[in-house]
Amino acid sequence: MEVRKAFMSDLPALLKIINAYAQQGIMLPRTEFEMAENIRDFSVVFSGETLLGCGALHFYGPSHGEVRSLAVSPESKQSGIGRAIVDALEEEARAQRLDSVFAFTYVPGFFRKLGFTEVEPGELPLKAWKD
């Protein structure tokens, strides 16, 4: 399985998977403009022309990053795609020399399995709470 950086041509597939989860109330919706503006944050996994999963690493200053918009297609759940994407985003965070990576999530158990721990809101960048 190859995790790669997203291209502008991936926008329709990204919007489809993210907004499908948003309609279920488990992810924030994204607009095409917002996605285009932040496309460099995204990593993806495809099988041929089919998007299997995506996730983004959004920077907050020089030392913090947030895993955002982590989504795996329903048919591909439990296949390791989510873990592979988070691993790639964490590798990117290390390459950028970030001190910490965090996630706001409706699925805390998944992130706990990957070694994330719950923290108090005051431990996160204030800007993250505003976004």
PLM regions and their residue ranges:
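Ligand-binding pocket scaffold of soluble enzyme catalytic domains
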Residues: L11-A22, F59
